[in-house]
C-alpha cells in the first residue's frame, strides 16, 4: 500500500475514533440528562400527589358534608346569636345540648340551610328540639397552637389530633386561639367575623375584642383579636418576646370573658403549658360563679422546662390578687421566692394535670431535677396523669398512602419491596442493597446529634446510607415505607413522631447511640407506665444497631414476626392517648 493511501487510511481511522468519542460523550450526556429528567419527573410526581391530596382535602371541606364541620359551624353560629343578643345564654345552652344529642342527625338536617341568616337559622333550631342529651363531654381548649392553622411544636399536633379523636368518640370539642397575624387561614373553613364586639378586663380597664370563627378538621375554632392591644399578636413569631406574660395573660382572660359572654357551659376547660395556665386561678377566683359551676379545669404540659416566672404585681393586670397568690402553696416560685411561677399556677389550680411523655412514668417525672417543680408535683401527685402522644393514622397508613408507588399492609407486605426500590432509585442508592438506614432529623437542631453521628459511623460503615437533615413531607412517607430500620434520636419524639410512624410502616425504630439506648432501662414497668412504653421496652429499647442488622440478615422469620406485630398495634390519637384523656375528664367531672 502506498504511503499516501496509508496516510489517508490513518486519517480516516482517527476521524472514526474522534466520531466514536463524540458519540460516546453525546450518549453519556444524553444518559445523564435522561436520569436528571427521570428524577425530575419522580419529584414532580411526589409533589403532584401531595397537591392532589391537598385539593381533595379542600374539596371535602368545601362540600360541607362532614357532620363534625356542620356541628362545629352550627355551634359557632349559636355563639354569634348570643353575642348579638338574638338569644339568651339559657336558650343557647339548650341548643348546644341538642347538638350533642346522639339520637339526632344534625348534619343531615342543617347541611342545606347553614347559608341562612341567623334569624332564619334560629327558627329552625327552635323547631328542632325536644331530644335528650348524650353522654359525651363538652371540651373547650384554650391554647396557643393548633395544626395546621398555627404550628410551632408538639402542642399544635396534640390539640388537633386529640380533638379529632375525641369528636370521633362522640364528644363535643371547641378551640379558642389568638388571632395571630401569621395564621394559615387557608386551612380554616367558613372563616367569618362575628358582627359584635365583646369586652375583656385588662390593666384596670375593659378593652374591646373582635371575634372570628371558622372550622378546622370539623372542629369549631374561635379567634380572639384584641383591638386596643392589637400589637400583642401581630408579630412575626408566636413566642419569644419580653412581654409574653402580658400577651398570653390577656388572651387567657379574654377567653374566659368570651366563654361567659357567649353563654358556654363546658364540662372541661382544657388549658396548655404556661401560656394559658393563668386560666386556672382566674377561673376559680373570678369566673366560677358566672354560670360555670359545673366546669372543671384540665392542664396539659408538653414540657416542664418552660414555666415563665414574673413579678407578682403583674398578676393584677388580668384581675388577680398578687398578695393572695404570692404564697408557697399557690404561685410563689419554689426557687425564686420573690417571683411567681405561671406554670405552677396551672398545676395548683387545675383538677387534673396531663404530662405528655412516651417513655417516662409519673414517679420519674416528679423526681426529675431539671424543672424545679418537684415539691409542687409531689403535693399534687394525685392530679398527675402521664399520657403518650399519638399520631394521625389516617394520614400515615401504608395501606392507603397516596405517596407510595405501591401500598401494603401487615397482611400483605409485597408493596414494601416496591417502595424500597423506588426509594433507592430516588436517592441514587444501589438497587441490590438489602438494607436502607436513615437518620430523619427534621429541619431544626437536634440535641446530641454530633455524638449520635459519631456512634453511627463507628457502628456501621456502609455506602448505602443517606442522612436526611431536612424534613420533606412527601419524601417522609417514602422513607418510612422503603426503610427496614429507622434511626431515632429519642423514643420520646412528640414532633416528628418517627418511632410511631416507623412501626406503622414496618420499619424497626432503633435509638441512635448507646447513651440513649441505655435510657431504656429507666422505663420501669410500674402501674404508671403506658402501654406504648412497655411495648417499646420489650421489643426495641435495648436492641443495638448491629443486633438489628444481624437479625434482619440471618433470622428473617423472627424479624418479620416482630415487624408485622408492630404494624398491627394502634398507637394513634384514637387509642391509648384518647382513652387516658377521657378517663381524666370523667374523674374530674365526678369531683
What are these regions (language model features)?
Residues 1-591:
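Catalytic cores of nucleotide-sugar-dependent glycosyltransferases that transfer UDP/GDP/TDP-activated
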Amino acid at each position: 500500500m502506498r504511503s499516501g493511501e496509508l496516510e489517508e487510511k490513518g486519517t480516516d481511522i482517527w476521524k472514526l475514533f474522534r466520531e466514536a468519542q463524540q458519540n460516546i460523550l453525546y450518549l453519556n450526556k444524553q444518559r445523564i440528562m435522561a436520569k436528571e429528567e427521570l428524577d425530575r419527573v419522580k419529584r414532580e410526581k411526589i409533589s403532584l400527589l401531595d397537591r392532589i391530596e391537598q385539593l381533595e382535602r379542600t374539596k371535602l371541606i368545601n362540600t360541607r358534608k362532614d357532620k363534625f364541620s356542620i356541628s362545629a359551624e352550627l355551634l359557632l353560629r349559636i355563639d354569634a346569636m348570643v353575642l348579638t343578643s338574638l338569644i339568651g345564654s339559657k336558650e343557647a345552652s339548650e341548643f348546644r345540648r341538642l347538638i350533642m344529642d346522639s339520637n339526632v342527625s344534625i348534619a343531615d338536617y342543617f347541611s342545606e340551610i347553614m347559608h341562612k341568616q341567623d334569624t332564619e337559622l334560629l327558627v329552625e333550631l327552635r323547631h328542632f328540639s325536644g331530644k335528650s342529651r348524650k353522654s359525651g363531654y363538652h371540651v373547650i381548649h384554650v391554647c396557643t397552637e393548633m395544626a395546621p392553622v398555627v404550628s410551632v411544636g408538639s402542642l399544635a399536633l396534640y390539640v388537633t389530633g386529640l380533638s379529632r379523636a375525641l369528636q370521633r368518640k362522640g364528644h363535643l370539642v371547641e378551640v379558642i386561639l389568638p388571632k395571630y397575624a401569621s395564621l394559615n387561614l387557608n386551612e380554616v373553613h367558613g372563616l367569618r367575623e362575628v358582627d359584635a364586639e365583646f369586652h375583656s378586663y385588662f390593666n384596670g380597664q375593659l378593652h374591646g375584642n373582635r371575634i372570628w370563627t371558622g372550622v378546622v378538621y370539623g372542629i369549631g375554632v374561635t379567634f380572639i383579636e384584641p383591638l386596643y392591644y392589637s400589637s400583642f399578636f401581630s408579630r412575626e413569631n408566636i413566642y419569644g418576646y419580653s412581654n409574653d406574660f402580658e400577651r398570653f395573660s390577656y388572651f387567657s382572660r379574654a377567653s374566659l370573658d368570651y366563654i361567659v359572654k357567649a353563654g358556654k357551659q363546658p364540662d372541661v376547660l382544657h388549658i396548655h403549658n404556661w401560656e394559658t395556665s393563668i386560666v386556672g386561678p382566674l377561673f376559680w377566683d373570678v369566673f366560677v360563679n358566672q354560670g360555670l359551676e359545673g366546669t372543671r379545669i384540665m392542664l396539659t404540659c408538653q414540657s416542664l422546662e418552660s414555666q415563665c416566672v414574673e413579678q407578682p404585681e403583674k398578676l393584677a393586670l388580668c384581675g388577680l390578687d398578687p398578695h393572695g397568690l404570692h404564697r408557697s402553696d399557690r404561685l410563689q416560685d419554689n426557687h425564686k421566692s420573690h417571683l411567681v411561677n405561671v406554670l405552677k399556677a396551672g398545676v395548683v389550680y387545675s383538677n387534673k394535670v396531663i404530662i405528655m411523655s412516651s417513655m417516662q412514668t409519673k414517679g420519674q417525672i416528679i423526681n426529675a431535677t431539671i424543672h424545679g417543680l418537684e415539691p409542687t408535683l409531689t403535693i399534687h401527685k394525685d392530679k398527675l396523669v402521664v399520657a403518650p402522644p399519638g399520631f394521625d393514622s389516617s394520614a400515615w397508613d401504608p395501606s392507603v398512602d397516596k405517596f407510595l408507588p405501591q401500598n401494603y399492609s401487615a397482611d400483605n407486605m409485597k408493596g414494601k419491596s416496591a417502595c424500597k426500590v423506588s426509594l433507592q432509585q430516588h436517592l441514587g442508592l444501589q438497587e441490590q442493597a438489602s438494607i436502607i438506614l436513615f437518620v430523619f432529623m427534621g429541619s431544626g437542631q437536634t440535641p446530641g446529634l454530633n455524638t449520635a453521628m459519631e456512634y453511627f459511623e463507628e457502628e456501621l460503615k456502609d455506602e448505602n446510607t443517606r442522612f436526611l437533615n431536612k424534613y420533606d413531607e412527601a419524601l417522609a412517607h417514602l422513607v418510612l415505607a422503603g426503610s427496614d430500620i429507622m434511626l431515632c434520636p429519642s423514643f420520646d419524639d412528640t414532633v416528628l413522631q418517627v418511632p410511631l410512624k416507623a412501626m406503622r410502616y414496618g420499619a424497626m425504630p432503633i435509638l441512635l447511640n448507646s447513651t440513649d439506648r441505655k435510657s431504656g432501662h429507666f422505663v420501669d414497668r410500674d402501674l404508671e407506665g403506658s402501654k406504648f412504653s412497655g411495648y417499646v421496652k420489650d421489643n426495641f429499647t435495648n436492641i443495638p444497631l448491629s443486633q438489628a442488622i444481624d437479625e434482619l440478615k440471618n433470622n428473617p422469620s423472627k424479624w418479620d414476626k416482630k415487624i408485622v406485630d408492630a404494624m398491627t398495634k394502634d398507637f394513634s390519637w384514637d387509642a391509648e392517648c384518647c382513652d387516658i384523656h377521657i378517663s381524666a375528664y370523667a374523674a374530674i367531672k365526678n369531683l
